[in-house]
Design a protein with these regions (language model features):
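Short, surface-exposed ligand- or partner-binding patches at beta-edge/loop junctions that are enriched
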Residues: 77
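Active-site flanking residues adjacent to catalytic metal/cofactor-binding acidic residues
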Residues: 35
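Bacterial Sec-type N-terminal signal peptides, specifically the leucine/valine-rich hydrophobic h-region
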Residues: 13-17
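Rhodanese-like catalytic fold shared by cysteine-dependent sulfurtransferases
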Residues: 2-8, 19-32, 40-72, 82-118
Length: 118
């Protein structure tokens, strides 16, 4: 059982980190949605231009009103990368297919080369 958990943990870690493991710039598709899953208070301190605020606590109940097509590319960030990873897993379970965990705000800003606004 422990071996199975270790293997599954490794696969999940590789899948999540593999979304953005290029270390360089990422180019979002034109129809992509940039999703900020932080709290409104965190969002007020700075956010990526064009990002849609959808706190993780509201993700499952409100995502369909923000992204109706489950094949739409969704790029997700938070403060540190933990909540964005959780968001990716929740959205996968809901049938969304094209998901990208950008990690924290500064990581996302560097990867996408999008300015941080306040």
């Amino acid at each position: 059982m422990k071996a199975l958990l270790s293997i599954l943990s490794g696969i999940i870690l590789l899948a999540v980190s593999g979304c953005c493991s290029t270390g360089g710039k990422i180019s979002m598709e034109n129809n992509a949605v940039l999703l900020d899953v932080r709290t409104p208070e965190e969002h007020k301190t700075g956010y990526l231009e064009g990002a849609v605020l959808l706190p993780l606590a509201e993700l499952e109940s409100k995502i369909s009103s923000k992204v109706a097509d489950k094949n739409t590319p969704i790029y997700i960030y938070c403060r540190s990368g933990r909540r964005s990873g959780t968001a990716v897993e929740k959205l996968k379970a809901m049938g969304y297919t094209d998901l990208h965990n950008l990690g924290g705000l500064k990581d996302a800003q560097e990867k996408l080369n999008i300015p941080i606004s306040k």
